[in-house]
């Protein structure tokens, strides 16, 4: 198991950033080389279940799919649970808050890999922060450019 905490300072509105983050149908825009397909399986007021087809491009080049449940705990807090696949049982918590006119995005990862894929732990530890930073930076740029009603 790998547990990681990351914090990112983003130059955008918290509300607009969170709106983009929870616009699941458009997530592939921020992960064009990785997220090949995203299908919403079940949608409710406070949670959404999605299935993604992902292509990993690190040491191994492999496509896989996973289902995940994304629960909106509050207006600034998401909880993600991976329901199947090699990382079944992994949890990610994403929370945002405004601080000095910046959005602070805190991410807590609790990653559980199957025995077959445990060799990926060092890669995940090494690559995760920069991967998230790239995604969140793209989202914050779009949030900053978004219209006020967004």
Predicted regions and their residues:
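Beta-strand/loop substructures that line and gate deep hydrophobic ligand-binding cavities in soluble
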Residues: 82-133
